[in-house]
């Protein structure tokens, strides 16, 4: 579960390395976000040559969470870290590559571009 002030790794090559959640999109009192949810993030660490600079505000979709969550079939899954992918206004990733595994739930939430770029879907 991701909430405001949570820090996440960036799982793409957009240039951002570490981001901090500043808003969970979807309702004025929504507190938590999980896999497939869109959040607004502030870039805390970025490569100096990247288009995305430190301090910029971007939208991102969560692809991995450390907290285990229940799937529809009754199984539970968790990852080693909290990670997100920076997206544009249309929901497409800003980077051209995705690093590490991503959750299968992204396919059902119309993030097929992220799923197709990912090396492993769990």
Swiss-Prot record:
Function of the molecule: Binds to 23S rRNA. Forms part of two intersubunit bridges in the 70S ribosome.
Family annotation (HAMAP family): Ribosomal_uL14
Keyword hit for rRNA-binding: yes
Family to which this protein belongs: Belongs to the universal ribosomal protein uL14 family.
GO cellular component: cytosolic large ribosomal subunit
UniProt source species: Treponema pallidum (strain Nichols)
A Pfam family hit: Ribosomal_L14
Subunit comment: Part of the 50S ribosomal subunit. Forms a cluster with proteins L3 and L19. In the 70S ribosome, L14 and L19 interact and together make contacts with the 16S rRNA in bridges B5 and B8. Interacts with ribosomal silencing factor RsfS, which may inhibit ribosomal subunit association.
Keywords: Ribonucleoprotein, Ribosomal protein, RNA-binding, rRNA-binding
Domain of life: Bacteria
UniProt keyword annotation of RNA-binding present: yes
Gene Ontology annotations of biological process type: translation
GO molecular-function terms, A-Z: large ribosomal subunit rRNA binding; structural constituent of ribosome
Listed Gene3D superfamilies: Ribosomal protein L14
Protein's name in the database: Large ribosomal subunit protein uL14
PROSITE patterns: RIBOSOMAL_L14
